[in-house]
Swiss-Prot record:
Entry keywords, A to Z: Acetylation, Cytoplasm, Membrane, Mitochondrion, Mitochondrion inner membrane, Mitochondrion nucleoid, Nucleus, One-carbon metabolism, Phosphoprotein, Pyridoxal phosphate, Transferase, Transit peptide
Subcellular localization, as worded in the UniProt entry: Mitochondrion; Mitochondrion matrix, Mitochondrion nucleoid; Mitochondrion inner membrane; Cytoplasm
Coiled-coil residues: none
Catalysed conversion reaction: (6R)-5,10-methylene-5,6,7,8-tetrahydrofolate + glycine + H2O = (6S)-5,6,7,8-tetrahydrofolate + L-serine
Protein source organism: Oryctolagus cuniculus (Rabbit)
Identification of the protein by name: Serine hydroxymethyltransferase, mitochondrial
Modified residues (N6-acetyllysine): 103, 181, 196, 356, 464, 469, 474
Domain of life: Eukaryota
Self-association and partners: Homotetramer; in the presence of bound pyridoxal 5'-phosphate. Homodimer; in the absence of bound pyridoxal 5'-phosphate. Pyridoxal 5'-phosphate binding mediates an important conformation change that is required for tetramerization. Interacts with ABRAXAS2; the interaction is direct. Identified in a complex with ABRAXAS2 and the other subunits of the BRISC complex, at least composed of the ABRAXAS2, BRCC3/BRCC36, BABAM2 and BABAM1/NBA1. Identified in a complex with ABRAXAS2 and IFNAR1. Interacts with KIRREL3.
Post-translational modification: Succinylation at Lys-280 inhibits the hydroxymethyltransferase activity. Desuccinylation by SIRT5 restores the activity, leading to promote cell proliferation.
Transit peptide: 1-29
Gene coding for it: SHMT2
InterPro entries according to UniProt: PyrdxlP-dep_Trfase, PyrdxlP-dep_Trfase_major, PyrdxlP-dep_Trfase_small, Ser_HO-MeTrfase, Ser_HO-MeTrfase-like, Ser_HO-MeTrfase_PLP_BS, SHMT-like_dom
Amino acid sequence: MLPFSLLWAVRPLQRCGPLVRTAVRAQHGKAAQTQTGEASRGWTGQESLSDTDPEMWELLQREKDRQCRGLELIASENFCIRAALEALGSCLNNKYSEGYPGKRYYGGAEVVDEIELLCQRRALEAFDLDPAQWGVNVQPYSGSPANLAAYTALLQPHDRIMGLDLPDGGHLTHGYMSDVKRVSATSIFFESMPYKLNPQTGLIDYEQLALTARLFRPRLIIAGTSAYARLIDYARMREVCDEVKAHLLADMAHISGLVAAKVIPSPFKHADVVTTTTHKTLRGARSGLIFYRKGVRTVDPKTGQEIPYTFEDRINFAVFPSLQGGPHNHAIAAVAVALKQACTPMFREYSLQVLKNARAMADALLERGYSLVSGGTDNHLVLVDLRPKGLDGARAERVLELVSITANKNTCPGDRSAITPGGLRLGAPALTSRQFREDDFRRVVDFIDEGVNIGLEVKRKTAKLQDFKSFLLKDPETSQHLADLRRRVQQFARAFPMPGFPEH
């Protein structure tokens, strides 16, 4: 019997017919030693990763083991479904296809044309969009390129934009700049002004947003977040945009899966353009989508002439040729697979469970005396404010990492340091994909609480962050506490199934 590594290499070839199977056998038999010409060179490209690059294979297996034995709580991460990973690792990686379906700059694109059109159709279907009123570009490489392409299409250089401030839960691509530096390319190429949370409620301050917009007169307002646990009032933001004659762009990268499942409100009723990633709550491969309105925008009251939206050509041109070259056809296919899944009843059940698990996690944290920004959650994440506990997110993140719990430090409203921010962001999507339920998340909070208490104890004995990190590794008693907690976390985590390939 062939070894597993060889079976894995041959398996996909068995669909290609007898000639391919014979060729593969010849490469490993006596015929391989007597062949002449091209075939005698021996290389076929059919060698497995484990045979060709054992070092990389070992690293992949280590990462797979890390994911299986740990608790993944980073809100922007999820576990991609196996079917999408198969598309991602397919022959589509080989095909170059600059341009759009039917208008390529390369030949041999008839199949990838069908794949891209299928992805477009599924994207519109997933969000119940009328093709006469909405279009979608599925070529952006990820969320940040999608946002920059949308800005390029909608704005002129140095036009004004408004987005939620990064320390208040916004994203870098929404125009972030510090007091001394324009950090994001968005703030370099455009003039940005942040809107913020109400420090008392932890909610977006829509009144202040409106006041700022009236003074700043932005051309674009971005409704999107990366660390905000509540729902966005898209209708209110539409009112502000209409008042100041601005476009409304909804960045639903974090919540698009929840929107597709119809478990939270959709931005499409109010937005002009909607962008998203595809690997977070959509549970697909890493890529980006840009949705845009099309059809009739308004009717001229004097002439009665219909005035159409002009987003389609501008957005398509911004993606290609302005910012990208050939699309990643393997990623587009993988996204199409995930979008098909997003239309199923099973995906809606998953999304509902994400919300239940996030609320269970929030309630368990509150019961243990933790402070949450905004006091709770309406979506897939919670933002814990550790400052009342006397700890910061950087120290908590490191302790949890050492016990196989992966979370990320995050700024809270009022934070002055991104190195030692006061918050810890926790998300439910990834562990929900491993079939965690509410009681499981309460157990996860027990582990987190143990880790935070270890962090508090070590902080009392150290000064600087680097001293804190060194003490965790060098103090025998602390190391023992960490090892015990890590053992229990890993034992708990390994009992749950993992999507994707079994070995890597």
